[in-house]
Amino acid sequence: TRLENDFGSRVQFVGLSSNSLITHPQDGPAQLAEQAQRHGWAFPYLLDDQQVLAKSLQAACTPEIYLFSHDSKGSSPTLQYRGQLDSSRPGNDQPLDGSDLRAALNAVLIGTSVSQNQVASVGCNVKWNPGQEPEWFG
């Protein structure tokens, strides 16, 4: 929410849940809406129940951060950043501050290159629909 407050007038944030509703019905629309309300998220929080977007992005875990940009001519979005929110992990005493994403956002907004030193996200794996696991998974 801090990132949304700091960048929301210049950036569109979107949340996406791609977990299987077959194996994880607790990740359904009502629960997502409750989660968004509990955390004060004002951005759209979408359900990818067919896992189409997750597969096209080659998502592996949750949370996984993607930052896209586009030029003023309306070109197709360009992936600028894929990685962790920050270095915080349960029990490591690192602050949950969004520093990695914040640095990438600042770079895109001022028109400089985003660092290629992008640390992969760590989290629970995407819960794929049975029999639909992508080839990179497992």
Where do the model's predicted regions map?
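Non-globular targeting/processing and membrane-anchoring segments
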Residues: 5-10, 14, 82-138
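Flexible, glycine-rich phosphate/dinucleotide-binding loops
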Residues: 22, 74, 88
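Structural microenvironment flanking redox-active thiols in thiol-disulfide oxidoreductases
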Residues: 1-38, 52-54
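Active-site donor-binding loop signature of nucleotide-sugar glycosyltransferases
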Residues: 18, 70, 85-87
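Short, internal strand/loop/helix patches
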Residues: 32-75, 79-80
